[in-house]
Amino acid sequence: MSCIFFSELFPIFTFFKEKIGHYARVLARKLDRDLSLSIRNLLTLKRKNMNFLKFLNRSSPVDTRAIEMDYLSLSFFFFGGSSWSLTRITASTSSCTDSSPLGRP
């Protein structure tokens, strides 16, 4: 069984955190509201992947083609019910056994 280590996932988490921040700022601008409210709106829309893009387009058109795949990747990674969900990745790393303290050879 291959193991996933946090040090290998950290750049991915950082990337997605930056992407979520970007989408929250886009949503704040589109709604002309403050960022904390927009983050709450973003979380409300987490189960409606494509509806988020339609929601952005409702007030004025934006080029959604550039962000569509990134948003789908984000929502799949963080909110999807697949084997790649964050909780299952975390659970799979705890089953790694090795003699070294960090789980590496």
From Swiss-Prot:
GO terms for cellular component: mitochondrion. It comes from Paramecium tetraurelia. It is found in: Mitochondrion. Keywords: Mitochondrion. This is Uncharacterized mitochondrial protein ORF10. It comes from the Eukaryota.
